[in-house]
Curated annotation (Swiss-Prot):
Occurrences of domain B5 (ranges): 401-476
Catalytic activity: tRNA(Phe) + L-phenylalanine + ATP = L-phenylalanyl-tRNA(Phe) + AMP + diphosphate + H(+)
Name of encoding gene: pheT
Localization terms from the record: Cytoplasm
Name used for this protein in its record: Phenylalanine--tRNA ligase beta subunit
């Protein structure tokens, strides 16, 4: 919403400066977005060129003698091609700042001739891009006066951002009312007396609508006969131009002026072009109208028009038709002021794609009590600017506004905002805002004015009191302190998410953020595709289902990188997957994909040899690292061979905690999965379920336990066991670890061997065992006894024997 300072002062009696007004507007919730104060133009004066002679030392320059109105001509050197004797232009004197050149003028010599100023072009004053010559004003322009005042450029332009509820401030009078209520002046009474008309309006208005659900709740029409339409006066044109409107003619400009001045949209018809009476009705399917924007619109039965016997003459409340528009030949004019259903206006405007100042106001809700005064204001302006004889104002379908009454306990202000506002202050604020007020010292009975349709309850009145009293008057309060140690801020799941994300990034993986929507084929390939997880209105055909896994998006991202030359890439994501349409079916998952040779130790070729393609063990290591970082008890995790159907059955695994709790899956992808997703290359991946990790036991103290380190040196022992080929290495590791859980602190497989020397169906698994004594150095007898325990444990759990 734009307006000029002088326009605001038509409604507000105030001595406040521009800065004070701007600051107060923001304080009361009418946030100022920009201020265009063209103060730089005030120094430039209108001057007449008395003589123009050729420069003695430059063919393209002229030496001008310029009259500034004080009887003392000024010498100026000028190179403009249109400089001539008699031209009236704009003079900048030494000390004046030229915004288009970003220079301050001074006395100078040009080719040996002194110049005491500069005749300016429009581009040099940033009025337009025109720079082919200096400004050429009308011959009767007042020489010696301020150019800014002459052109109306000395009036600052203020632009505010309105929230949708403040329909009352779509008119400058509403803004002035708020400023007056905030103590920045007095609101002027600018409403004119009713215009006395003679005779009835010959064109009648018929409301063809459902009386129980009307879309037009009032229609005022008046004819002014014998008008003389032409350009609007300079002051009106300057104001309309300042707010971004193009002056057209006096009749049209008046309607635009009243729209911004009062927030009251109007329309004018050329009475000679209207055939018969005006009927407010629904449009008929297939009807068309050529609107004032020179575009033809196709209407349907869900839209509303003002029509005559020729057909639609106006799209109700949005835009008039070209056929009945007013021009310089208009003699008799019909002035229309009506009330329209905001929902109807919004729906029609969206469907036709029309955005107008009238639609902007009607769909937010205009003041119903301004329908008749708006027509009177427009009539008065028409009579002043165009002459003519008005008829009696014809009002159809209007019912007086019924005001809403709200009982408002003043204590609500303190309860909702923390502001201490006295009963008297709250009473006075609401009264200044135009509310009808009465009360008993505790509760105010407030009658909502017609222009505040957004005020519906006590909370709205609290807001009104708060913004006028001053939000900046809320006393600052320190945040509450609950002791030396702050309470926990993040939830367990948030902590797990953060730790898993950091761990995967530290393993050389790059974080990706993929869509939660995937295609139906992708969803079904990863165990999804349930009807309840299909989107009702997908943004694209290949984004129709909520994802059951992170892997489809990560695989697609890896393939896109490979298609662009980045074959070796490792990606991860920590986000949600969806197993159903209830909140408990949304799970927090950390997933990752490695492609090509993107291993933890590096990718591609290096000095020690070519890197091998990624495989199942890379995915396993990533999954276990993420789980450990998230706080899972990895020493108790069981690894079962095989995984979901989208993973390779012989190169995948499932991570479990006990027989029922699944913590994750990992492995290489099934060839059918890669084919279905149209991806290729060496690929492995994993998913771990962060929400499946059991909650840690509550600690008795917030401090970490004391670090206990052994004083004795650790030692390692190697063992090789011959087991059946079907025995997994992990089972051997668990058997060794269980032999003595206090002494054995680490077990690692370092060799697997198969050969004829072991016998058919046999293999050798070699492990390194790390021992850490706690209370004494181990003797040979201790080591021998431990070895027997390890061999016995492996034999019992796997059937393996110590290799000779």
């Amino acid at each position: 919403m734009k307006f000029t300072l002088s326009w605001l002062k038509d409604h507000l009696e105030t001595d406040a400066t521009l800065d004070e007004i701007v600051e107060k507007l923001t304080d009361i919730g009418l946030e100022v977005e920009s201020v265009d104060d063209r103060a730089a133009f005030r120094a430039f004066t209108i001057a007449r060129v008395l003589t123009a002679t050729r420069h003695p030392d430059a063919d393209k320059l002229q030496v001008l003698s310029v009259d500034t109105g004080d009887g003392k001509p000024v010498q100026v050197v000028c190179g403009a091609p249109n400089a001539r004797a008699g031209l009236v232009g704009v003079l900048g004197r030494p000390g004046d700042y030229v915004p288009g050149l970003d220079v301050t003028l001074s006395v100078g010599k040009i080719r040996g001739v002194e110049s005491f100023g500069m005749m300016c072009s429009e581009r040099e004053l940033e009025l337009s891009d025109e720079h082919n010559g200096i400004i050429d004003l009308a011959e009767n322009a007042p020489v010696g006066t301020s150019f800014a005042a002459y052109m109306g450029l000395d009036d600052p332009i203020i632009e505010i951002g309105l929230t949708p509820n403040r329909a009352d401030c779509t008119g400058i009078r509403g803004i002035a009312r708020d400023l007056a209520a905030a103590g920045l002046g007095t609101l002027k009474n600018t409403l004119p007396d009713a215009v006395k008309g003679e005779g009835e309006t010959p064109v009648k208005v018929i409301l063809d609508q459902d009386a129980g659900n009307p879309f037009c709740t009032g229609f005022a029409l008046r004819m002014v006969k014998g008008v003389k339409n032409g350009p609007s006066p300079k002051w009106m044109q300057q104001r309309l131009k300042a707010i971004g409107l193009r002056p057209i003619n006096a009749l049209v400009d008046i309607t635009n002026y009243v729209t911004f001045d009062q927030g009251r949209p109007l329309h004018v018809f050329d009475a000679a072009k209207v055939k018969g009476n005006l009927t407010v009705r629904t449009a008929r399917d297939g009807e068309t109208i050529l609107a004032l924007d020179q575009r033809e619109y196709k209407l349907n039965a869900g839209m509303y028009v003002i029509a005559d016997e020729n057909g639609p003459e106006s799209i109700a409340g949005i835009m008039g038709g070209e056929h009945s528009g007013c021009d310089e030949n208009t003699v008799d004019v019909l002035i229309e002021s009506a009330l329209w259903d905001p929902r109807m206006i919004a729906s029609t405007g969206r469907e036709l794609g029309i955005v107008t100042d009238a639609r902007y106001r009607f769909e937010r809700g205009v003041d119903p009590e301004m329908m008749v005064p708006g027509a009177e204001i427009a009539t008065k302006l028409v009579l002043e600017l165009c002459g003519g004889q008005p008829t009696v104002l014809d009002v159809v379908g209007y019912k007086p506004h019924t005001a809403r009454v709200i009982d408002f306990p003043v204590t609500e202000v303190k309860r909702l905002t923390g502001l201490d506002v006295s009963y008297e202050d709250a009473f006075d604020i609401l009264k200044r805002l135009g509310f009808g007020v009465e009360g008993d010292g505790k509760t105010i009975r407030a009658t909502v004015p017609s222009w505040r349709g957004d005020v519906e309850g006590k909370a709205d009145l609290v807001e009104e009191v708060m913004r006028i009293h001053g939000i900046n008057r809320i006393d600052p309060q320190p945040l509450p302190s609950h002791g030396a140690v702050n309470g926990r801020i993040l939830t367990t799941l948030q902590i797990r998410t953060r730790h898993a994300r950091r761990m995967l990034a530290s393993r050389g993986m790059m974080e990706a953020v993929t869509y939660s929507f995937i295609s139906e084929a992708q969803a079904k390939a990863f165990g999804g595709g349930k009807p309840e997880l299909k989107l009702a209105n997908p943004i694209a055909a290949d984004m129709s289902d909520m994802r059951p896994s992170l892997l489809p998006g990560l695989l697609a991202a890896a393939q896109r990188n490979a298609d662009r030359g980045f074959d070796d890439i490792a990606l991860f994501e920590v986000s949600g997957i969806y197993e159903g349409d209830t909140p408990d079916k949304q799970r927090r998952v950390a997933g990752g994909v490695r492609r090509g040779t993107a291993k933890v130790e590096g990718a591609g070729r290096f000095w020690a040899g070519n890197a091998a393609p990624v495989g199942v063990f890379d995915a396993k290591a990533d999954a276990l690292a993420a789980l450990e970082a998230a706080g899972a008890p990895v020493d108790r995790i069981q690894i079962e061979a095989g995984g979901p159907e989208w993973l390779h059955p012989g190169r995948s695994g499932t991570l479990k905690l006990g027989p029922k709790v699944v913590l994750g899956t990992f492995g290489e992808f099934h060839p059918d999965t890669l084919e279905a997703l149209d991806v290729s290359g060496a690929l492995c991946g994993f998913e771990v379920y962060l929400d499946a990790i059991p909650e840690p036991k509550a600690k008795s103290a917030r401090t970490k336990p004391a670090l206990s380190l052994s004083l004795f040196q650790s030692l390692k022992r190697d063992y090789a066991f011959v087991v059946d080929a079907a025995v997994e290495a992990g089972n051997v590791v668990k058997a060794v670890s269980s032999a003595d859980k206090k002494l054995i602190v680490g077990v690692q497989v370092f060799d697997i061997f198969t050969g004829a020397s072991l016998g058919e169906g046999k293999k050798s698994i070699a492990v390194e065992v790390l021992l850490q004594p706690q209370d004494r150095t181990l003797t040979d007898e201790d080591l021998e006894a431990l070895s027997k325990q390890i061999v016995a444990s492996v034999a019992k759990q796997t059937g393996g024997v110590l290799r000779g």
